[in-house]
From Swiss-Prot:
This is Pyridoxine 5'-phosphate synthase. Keywords: Cytoplasm, Pyridoxine biosynthesis, Transferase. It is an enzyme of class 2 (transferase). It is found in: Cytoplasm. It catalyses: 3-amino-2-oxopropyl phosphate + 1-deoxy-D-xylulose 5-phosphate = pyridoxine 5'-phosphate + phosphate + 2 H2O + H(+). Its EC number is 2.6.99.2. The keyword Electron transport does not apply. The keyword Cytoplasm applies. Pathway: Cofactor biosynthesis; pyridoxine 5'-phosphate biosynthesis; pyridoxine 5'-phosphate from D-erythrose 4-phosphate: step 5/5. The active site is at H43, E69, H185. GO terms for biological process: pyridoxine biosynthetic process.
Length: 232
């Protein structure tokens, strides 16, 4: 069965638009878990534009595993090692971007990433790397000791059969390298099926669509439907 990680960042975006504490992303996470989510994903960005530091321990205390998305900075590594979530996913981060625009270039940053990955693993945290579906990136992830890669599906979500073929090829490389395969970004009811069919896929992390669709259908029904679709 493919696991569904629900990203609750944009509940925090809505909260922060007015200040205060409502809507509470932790309450949304609890509802997602009760509705079948296998885990919760939260991205504590350097600019704190949605998730706040105070949210993270509360999310860590929930019954489902927490996947802490983070930039590969000394500050975030320290926070993660103190928090000790189930998993950390290292992602690229630019202050001017609206959302994560591509995968982490681990080939170009391998020397800087190696000690950070080692420190997180020494803290008992499962490390994943959010990367584009390229063989060199996947092979470098394996060489760096990361047990998981999350393939960036954003280009596929924008359309194009060529992108799906890249993802299929990448899934084969992930398997050949002995890594666990995750995927995410831009996935919806309409496009998730082909990604769920990738060979060896263990987990999907989906956020923006689920929170947006929940405005119309409610978060519980949306999570249940997505969980059903990815395992049908």
């Amino acid at each position: 069965m493919i696991r569904l990680g629900v990203n609750i960042d944009h509940v925090a975006t809505l909260r922060n638009a007015r200040g205060g504490t409502f809507p509470d992303p932790v309450a949304a996470a609890e509802l997602a878990i009760a509705s079948g989510a296998d885990g919760i994903t939260a991205h504590l960005r350097e600019d704190r534009r949605h998730i706040r530091d105070a949210d993270m321990p509360r999310l860590r205390a929930l019954s489902a595993p927490l996947n802490f998305e983070m930039a590969a900075t000394d500050e975030m590594v320290r926070i993660a090692c103190d928090l000790r979530p189930h998993a950390c996913c290292l992602v690229p981060e630019k202050r001017q971007e609206v959302t994560t625009e591509g995968g982490l270039d681990i080939v170009g940053q391998s020397e800087a990433l190696k000690p950070k990955i080692a420190r997180l693993r020494d803290a008992g945290i499962r490390v994943s790397l959010f990367i584009d579906p390229e063989a060199r990136q996947i092979e470098t992830a394996a060489a760096l000791g990361a047990p998981v890669v999350e393939l960036h599906t954003g280009a596929y979500a924008l359309g194009g059969s060529e992108e799906l073929e890249r993802l299929r090829s990448a899934a084969g490389t992930v398997a050949a390298c002995g890594l666990e395969l995750h995927a995410g970004h831009g996935l919806t009811y309409d496009n998730v099926g082909a990604i769920a069919d990738l060979t060896g896929l263990a987990e999907l992390n989906i956020g923006h669509f689920l929170i947006g669709q929940a405005i119309f259908d409610g978060l519980g029904p949306v999570v249940r439907k997505m969980k059903s679709l990815i395992n049908s």
